[in-house]
From Swiss-Prot:
Residue stretches making up the KH type-2 domain: 204-281
Residues annotated as binding GTP: 15-22, 62-66, 124-127
CDD domains the UniProt entry points to: Era, KH-II_Era
Keywords: Cell inner membrane, Cell membrane, Cytoplasm, GTP-binding, Membrane, Nucleotide-binding, Ribosome biogenesis, RNA-binding, rRNA-binding
Keyword Cytoplasm: yes
PROSITE patterns reported for this sequence: G_ERA, KH_TYPE_2
Encoding gene per record: era
Gene Ontology terms for molecular function: GTP binding; GTPase activity; ribosomal small subunit binding; small ribosomal subunit rRNA binding
Natural source organism: Rickettsia bellii (strain RML369-C)
Single GO BP term: ribosomal small subunit assembly
Subcellular location: Cytoplasm; Cell inner membrane
Name of the featured protein: GTPase Era
Region ranges (G3): 62-65
Amino acid sequence: MTKQIQKTVSVCIIGRPNSGKSTLLNRIIGEKLSIVTPKVQTTRSIITGIITLNDTQIILYDTPGIFEPKGTLEKAMVRCAWSSLHSADIVMLIIDSLKPLDSITHDILNKLRSLNVVPVFLLNKIDVESKYIDDTKAFLAENYSDSLLFPISAISGENVDKLLEYITSKAKIAPWLYEEDDITDLPMRFIAAEITREQLFLGLQQELPYKLTVQTEKWEELKDKSVKINQIIVVSRESYKTIILGKNGSKIKELGAKSRMQMQQFFGFPVHLFLFVKVQELWEDNSDYYEYMKI
């Protein structure tokens, strides 16, 4: 019996916050792995997605959005994004076609050039008419003629098949790093924490989501094949804790119920979720939390 030839290729997706990196990762692997919210800077660490197509295994790295960082946490997130380039065969810069090229995007382009990285450009959100797209295409064609450009829509899937064909064509003969059915190498504890953090981002207003983190403290498999999960929501102020709890605990119950449903849908088994809120001032300056967040 002839042994199947195996190929692998790794892809790093970088770009500004809310340009569609996480949506594209989820679109390609066919699962909602990387959390997506309307708020910027939702992704804090490198999220690894895996898809195996015939003989080729594609490893995708979704990265934190690159912006001008201010605090310690923001600086760590941006460093994390740039560090992902070293692990990739292909670097893809995703650009929001609904916005003009701004100074941050130009800074990203300049840094890639200084690193001798020739990116593949992904002009995202083409499912919506844009007055900026022609100017962006013209600028990239004139200044980055060595780079390929794919106009895509991560949310609708338009042209993502062509992008996958290109990625697959760049794969090299090498043993797969993961099992054929794997979609990520992230621990389930981490994924569960990200699911809860997504619900906090969606359910809380203004700046509060940026002032918290979530840790899965306990993961206990029960005899009935369900799992008991204890999570701690860490905030920097007592007033934030009050908001998350809500009147008579109503808000945290609502957020917990939504998180539990998402976990059950993703993991495929019943979940008993218990959320607790802890106040720790300046937790953003504690490197122990960064290690847990993988940044």
